[in-house]
Amino acid sequence: MKTLALFLVLVCVLGLVQSWEWPWNRKPTKFPIPSPNPRDKWCRLNLGPAWGGRC
């Protein structure tokens, strides 16, 4: 019974390690950090002036 509990704990820890990435291993995000200005966001999405896309 004790070995089963130990095995379950090991599986949980391994799952956590798999899902958690090292900070230096993290892939760079595709998009830059969005600015707080929503108009600038629409501008970058190229939706045009009708959607507040004036640059």
Curated annotation (Swiss-Prot):
Residues 20-33 are annotated as: Essential for binding to sperm. Changing W51A: Complete loss of activity. Complete loss of activity. The keyword Metal-binding does not apply. Changing S19A: In strain: Berkeley, M2, M26, M36, M40, M55 and SFS 3.4. Main cells of the accessory glands of males (paragonial gland). The modification Isoleucine derivative is found at I33. Sperm-bound protein is cleaved to release an active C-terminal peptide. Gradual release from stored sperm may function to prolong PMR and enhance male reproductive success. Changing C55A: Complete loss of activity. Disulfide bonds join C43-C55. The modification Hydroxyproline is found at P28, P32, P34, P36, P38. GO terms for molecular function: G protein-coupled receptor binding; hormone activity. This is Accessory gland-specific peptide 70A. It comes from Drosophila melanogaster (Fruit fly). The gene is SP.
